[in-house]
Amino acid sequence: MSINFLSIPRNRFKAIGVLSVTCILIYVILHSSIITTDFDVSDYGDKFIPSIIFDDNNDNGENLKDPQPELDNDKGNGETDTTTSNSMTTAHTFWKGIFDTFDKYKMDLGQDPENAVSYVDKLKQKQGPLNKEVLLSKAIVSSELMKHLKEKHSGVVEDLPSVMPGSVYNKGSKGVVIIGGGKFSWLAYLALVQLRNVGSKLPVEIVMPSRADYEKELEFCENTLPEMQASCVVLPDVLGEAVMKNRKFASYQFKALALVVTSFEHILLLDSDNMIVSNPDEIFESKLYHQYGMITWPDYWKRTISPLFYDVAEIEVNENKRVRYNRFPLYNAPNVRSNIYTDQEREEVPFHDLQGSIAELSTESGQLIINKHTHGKTILLALYYNFYGPNLFYKLFSLGEQGEGDKDTFVAAAVVTRQDYYQVKSFIKTFGYADSDDKFQGVSMGQRNPLIDRKHYEDHVLALLEKDSFKSSSIADQIEQMKKFENEDFDQHNSIPLFTVHCNYPKLDPKLYMSRDDLYDEKEKKLKYRLYGNLKYTKEVVKDGETGTEASTDKVQIDFELQQWQHMQDILCLKKIYFTHFIDNDMNELCQFIENQVAWLSKSQN
């Protein structure tokens, strides 16, 4: 049957046209509706939001045992697909399989999930060294829930792929990843400027948690960042429609998600308020990185991971053998199965000094270096832990002590997957100021250069372990020697250069400073204190040589606090780069404050 369109009356032709357009619009709307969250990233990094982690009924029971063989077109040689479109489709398929696996092993925490892991009143907890009994006294988990957790955990560890396919990262690529969006785009850019200032050539990806974040900062992503060899990565675009449909992510999951969506194979993950003060580029070429594939840094506190987690994860801990003091190893002959013989000795030994446990100290995740190829399963399992963080794993990893959050999920995942990591041995150096009551207020954490820390550790600690005199000494004598290392060579005042300064409280934000009556001098339009004291770091500066001579390198001392304010002045007041974070601010007033601060710090830097 044929239709002669010329014979159709004009009014009917118009009706057909309108109907056709309407049908097309309905089709487009139905097939492009991805439910995403307009994320409130204002809470990122400050606290987590105790909310429902999953809003996803897509529990179809599908299991992705190991998607790599069918997803990776290169059959394992790490090359990406021939076209961007095919590569993205392949990556989306992989991530759908991963999240289907997460859904299959969804933790059921009962009708009262917030109390599935129930903290015990501190007055009722056992006191003393953090041995097994003391740790177990801090929280209660029912035997029924323990059985459920063990089954689900065993299943997800079994079903997650051992490696990620080449379609989800660019083979051989190295770079820095920072989370942006809202105020964190401002902080991320300040961190980017500092990174370039210390000489780093690494590309940078700033992760936008939602498409709304990206669209609000289109100018920032498309024009400002490329000038600094940086770009935006939009999280839902990388994961794909099938993953994002009906699924919501919370702020405490963004750090693990950033590792997932970055295109880099070799990753330095930075909190947006973390300032690099030592060029990180050489780390990816180092023996340390190639040996371990993952580098972490310590937090202030000792590990309080519950022995129950070791049961859930089926990690065997030898309760009769002490193998370390704090984060420093002790010598034990290879054939010695036990060196703890009495109940009194057992009570005196911290649980995390035992063979099979995770070594001290707890981990501070403001910076993390990791290889996406060798440690892909660690990243995936850490993401799983963060899905059930606030009500489950954060509690099992902290037991109500300070520092609860995502920080220990990465090391725990590495131990479960049996993938190596090196944790820096040097203790955090705290920077701050004395307030009007002469009370010290900490504002930032200084972490040490991992390469020099490792060299220091090899030259002092590991070298001592090779000496026959040390091998023949008692455990008690060995501990005394390790205490000296702890208090002298690796304490917060050691000589190992800084790597980062984590400016987490308060953050480097002039808008925030002006709202703080305890910090801001309204009359003088400047801060009342030098917040970072006399913090200086060493920077190498290349000097042009005279005619016929080679350029030389000088080492200069940089006033950290003054430099950050100079960066703010350049970004906001001279270049006038736009940030949505300051949309409601009078920029003239803000820049007057910044100008006053630069002038005041310049006079007081000596």
From Swiss-Prot:
Alphabetical UniProt keywords: Golgi apparatus, Membrane, Signal-anchor, Transferase, Transmembrane, Transmembrane helix
Lipid bilayer topology: Single-pass type II membrane protein
Region Disordered: start-end pairs: 59-86
Residues on Extracellular side: 36-606
GO MF terms, alphabetically ordered: alpha-1,2-mannosyltransferase activity
Localization per Swiss-Prot or TrEMBL: Golgi apparatus membrane
Gene Ontology CC terms: Golgi apparatus; Golgi membrane
Superkingdom of the source species: Eukaryota
Top-tier EC class: transferase
Pfam families linked: Mannosyl_trans3
Knockout consequences: Leads to hypersensitivity to toxic ergosterol analog, amphotericin B, calcofluor white, and to thermosensitivity.
GO BP, sorted A to Z: mannan biosynthetic process; protein mannosylation
Cytoplasmic side: 1-14
Transmembrane segments: 15-35
Compositionally biased spans, kind Basic and acidic residues: 62-78
Pathways involved: Protein modification; protein glycosylation
Classification via InterPro entries: Alpha_mannosyltransferase, Nucleotide-diphossugar_trans
SUPFAM superfamilies cross-referenced by the UniProt entry: Nucleotide-diphospho-sugar transferases (SSF53448)
Enzyme Commission designation: 2.4.1.-
Function: Alpha-1,2-mannosyltransferase required for cell wall integrity. Responsible for addition of the first alpha-1,2-linked mannose to form the branches on the mannan backbone of oligosaccharides. Addition of alpha-1,2-mannose is required for stabilization of the alpha-1,6-mannose backbone and hence regulates mannan fibril length; and is important for both immune recognition and virulence.
Sequence similarity: Belongs to the MNN1/MNT family.
Name of this chain's protein: Alpha-1,2-mannosyltransferase MNN23
Source organism: Candida albicans (strain SC5314 / ATCC MYA-2876) (Yeast)
Annotated gene: MNN23
